[in-house]
């Protein structure tokens, strides 16, 4: 069997998230976070040629894994296998454009959508991408290498107040203003171009016992800003809400409180702010029925096998 690129993380909560889709014969499904293809592979196995899967990823590295999936699921003697005849269409795009792409493919309803919002091990472990403070490399952080703005652009060009807001809102760091001031001071001396340049500028502000946690939050905040992650997530989930048929399922895995709050609010109220809507008679209107009232988390065995799954939370909802 041809393996998916080993640099991508092991699919988190694989069985629970796919079970949550309640896959039906002939259904149309979407995996908006293809990555190494782990979740897509399982969906395709359950569709078993009777239905279709649209898989999204904006990273060109992820696209290289598509042929592996096709080879695994196709007859070894079939040399003409393609994405289409194994029930898969790969879309190299940010998932925020979900509705546009479905219109392009003339799809006006779907039966289920899965999103695994975690940054893959592939990104964290590649020093050339700049996602991790463990390596020295270009301060990049773009999920889509074709996108314009890098993390270096953010730290070198944003005003001090804007930087402070990013670190406070997306990193939930109480020392955001001090961090922003330290960056301004450092870049006045020398342009911040690498992860180590950035770390040197802010490291003195962190207490030793919290240094790794706070540095991770700081890198998270920059990554979210560079990739417009919160806006993209809101747009994708609202599009999914429109596209899902009655009884269709939404299965979403989150890894930090900011994205989890958005997912929870949209599943409960239909909007990212969590504002309850009422009809003419004062009855609360909600687009979804929650399948799990409490979040599903990896069990101890999965957390031991895959430490990066520890912060994962799965929420599942069904369209009313």
Pin down the residues of each PLM region.
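S-adenosyl-L-methionine-dependent methyltransferase catalytic core, i.e., the SAM/SAH-binding region
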Residues: 1-320
